[in-house]
Amino acid sequence: RQKQLAGTMSGGQKQRLALACAVIHGPELLFLDEPTSAVDPESRRDFWERLFELADAGTTLLVSTHLMDEAERCHRLAILDHGALVADGTPAELTGRLAGRTFVVEADDPRRAQRALADVPGVLGVAQVGNALRVLTGEAAAQDGSTSGVAQRLQDAIAKAGQPARVAAAAANLEDVFVAATRTGRARTERAA
């Protein structure tokens, strides 16, 4: 491939070439913007392995990504919303702050259930994942850790739409953290305006 022009390379090959060019001088700090865009899953794993090797060798990496599964690979995260820092910490710290606020809803008609939940006070986001819904609320669990009050409100809203459903608390993931941080930040901005 020595004579191949960069413009004729695949997305993954271009990304590997860009990384090689970026590290050839042994930088102490490396900024990577969406480093694995247009890269297949296997190449993505290889790419991240190279990044960890660089980190082990002492290079500080700053990675921007909109892919939460990539963000989970990082040691520390900072979530920006319109240029403002709205959350930061380790993946475990960030997801831990959302304990008791995420639910999985299983319903016969997930789209109808999603519409029923859209206007429930305190619901920050509803996303369909497969045949289930992932619901993020702005309300934390009760002091005893119970989420039954929130779960019951969600179930009641869906039942009111004539849709039987099962609602269960779920562990938060980084996508939930991102949605909570950016929606909460927007609400603050809208109130200030």
PLM segments and residue spans:
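Solvent-exposed, non-membrane alpha-helical residues enriched in polar/charged side chains
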Residues: 52, 92-95, 155, 179
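Short, flexible active-site loops
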Residues: 74-78, 96-101
